[in-house]
Amino acid sequence: YFSKAVLAALPYMEFVPDIIQCNDWQTGLIPVFLKTMYGSDEFYRNIKTVFAVHNMKFQGRWKINEVVDITGLPHHIFNSNELESYGEANYLKGGIVYADAVSTVSPSYAHDITTPEGGEGLHGLMEARKDVLHGILNGLDYAEYNPADDKYIKFHFDKNDISNKRKNKEYLQKATGLTVDDNALLIGIVSRMTDQKGFDLVAYVIDEILETMDV
């Protein structure tokens, strides 16, 4: 309903965007609706869409008949070249197929999702759309996230003096109830514990770490 409402609201707002930026499967039907149900209307004719994929694992899969009933989309577009994937309606696939351009979080991830290992079953589609696939590297605002004055860091440091990192390590050990040990290996990270976040790299070297460090 949200995806359809985005398009339906535009005439009431008297706003014709040049580009609609869509993000992940939750907005995957916006490019689909635009080209199948709204595209013939002159109001929408020149609107383009960019579809951003942050994680190929989350695809928004549902029963085809239920999606047809809820959305009003024509049944014939639920085929292997468009919205159907492994017998289900796939919102992520719809966004990728119908968008004018597709972006993702880095050039390396843009490559990874064209491979069987990274494509989560849609690598063939990503390979087919690679001409409009762009990897845009995620980044930080270094003015806001600066360890020299970041309000969320207990003890500040910079590239010229990193001595306070030891104090931060001690602070984190105390805050989490760990034994305070300057020599102990400590990794602090805010993340989902999945291979996609690099935890597989930790698993890859953990045996060597256990053999060479007191952890």
Language model: regions and residue ranges:
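Catalytic cores of nucleotide-sugar-dependent glycosyltransferases that transfer UDP/GDP/TDP-activated
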Residues: 1-215
